Amino acid sequence: RLEKAKMAISRMVEKLSNDKIGLIVFAGDAYVQLPITTDYSSAKLFLSNISTDIVPVQGTAIGSAIDLAARSFTPETETSKAIIVITDGENHQDDAVAAAKQAHEKGIVIHTIGMGLEQGAPIPEKGKPGQFMQDGQGNVVISKLDEQTLQDIAKAGEGLYIRASNTEVGLNRLLDEVNRMEKSLLEERGYSDYAEKYQYF
């Protein structure tokens, strides 16, 4: 699923022009993989280097990732800002809906894409082929797609929730929405500017 998301983001980057993009990766914690930039070649390079090994803490801290993404924007810019959350798991670490509300108060729209399975799937152990994470009681940990939370996050951020299919991740639809949002903003202001878009895992 990670490779599928990376390919979709790479294709989206190819369609950008005069837009800023950044990358944040998250599991049990969130890290800036690529600061906001218009250097699309660097974006694709940093994207290609993303793997499950670069985040040491397991989990799904969506709220931390949203907070970090929101802080990464240039504060005083008048351009439209969007965060796209792509995840395949449940959120256990923090209050992601509250984080989305706080980000939206700063003028940031939050979109979410769910890539997991509602019935869930075991989480592979790093460096241990064929073995899966276990909880304190020795039970295999099952990571399930929590669509309700992702819908709530998108609602709090006045964005869209998209369930990824086997053939389409949903980034094209979100890119159209972000471009529409920017066009509406430009019509209101009557001058041209560029959008600050933020992409992260």
Spans of model-derived segments:
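Short, hinge-like loop/turn segments at secondary-structure boundaries
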Residues: 39-42, 128-131, 179-182
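VWA/integrin I-like adhesion module and closely mimicked acidic/polar interface patches used
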Residues: 56-60, 82, 89-156
